[in-house]
């Protein structure tokens, strides 16, 4: 949620922006968790990577929040609305004939999570549990 209300122009633009933010967040969640899994296999723990990200140009409120959840493995058990918003955004992109391959892959990851009952959490928990499943590791808390 943003800190202020912004006028985004014509009627319908707010829905476009809402879905765009969900699409951006979905790719960000999945990519950060994927990178953490790869680094862990290489011997670098998530806490160290969190420190690196926090002290880099990639630092943001979003990356700090995602990395804190990845490190703590304390996932909020709740329904995530992100997959629904991403799906709506992809539908709009198809209608506009705009290819969205990264967002499409993130959406497919959410679909895999749903099919394997890994979707009962907020987005970071979904991503972490899904990547644990893919990598044959024990799922985190949840």
Where are the predicted features?
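Ligand/cofactor pocket segment of small-molecule handling proteins
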Residues: 1-18
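A charged, well-structured terminal subsegment
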Residues: 4-8, 81, 86, 140-142
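Helical "substrate-binding/catalytic lid" subdomain
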Residues: 14-133
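Hydrophobic alpha-helical segments
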Residues: 131-142
